[in-house]
Amino acid sequence: MVTLLFFDCEFTDLSDSASLVSAGFISQSGEQFYAELSDYQEEACNEFVKTTVLPLLSSCPISTVDFVSSLTDWLSKLDGDFLFIADSEWDQKILTKTFAALGKTIPSDWQFQKTPDNFTNGMQRCLFNDEMAAFFLRHPDQKPHHALTDARAIRNAYLRAESGY
């Protein structure tokens, strides 16, 4: 059985030296995991991250070591092989880099997919994009670029696009 996990990462900038700031995950059935990290360098954040992402942080931050441990513990409670779905290749890249910084590799039963590119039907791709925008209109209290909120929006848009609405 494959378990769909929708996720989003926020990170310091769009470069090979980027560090994870926060990550949000939500399963197809609605279980959630969210963490903010404590060991990124704020001065490494680009201006967009400083003005848009950092003001949305509100949880007690944890270390990268605790993040990886907590995430793998949370995932161990879910069934099946995992298909992680994000709306950017950067999310997989930064998650992989975060594990690698601790000398760990992403488990072989974790697969990744970028959406909406995974939809072969152009109508589904359009529906996904429309639903991403509509999510924030329907939930004005939810702000884009908060990792868990974005993961929720991706989940909502993906499931609606997959079902054809």
Could you describe each region identified by the protein language model?
Residues 1-3:
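N-terminal accessory regions of nucleic-acid-interacting proteins
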Residues 26, 100-104, 163:
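Short, surface-exposed basic-aromatic patches at helix termini and helix-loop junctions that form
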Residues 88, 94, 131-165:
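Acidic, Mg2+-coordinating catalytic module of metal-dependent nucleases/exonucleases
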Residues 90-112:
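Substrate-recognition/cap helix-loop segment adjacent to the acidic, metal-dependent catalytic center
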Residues 108-132:
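Short, flexible loop segments at boundaries between secondary-structure elements
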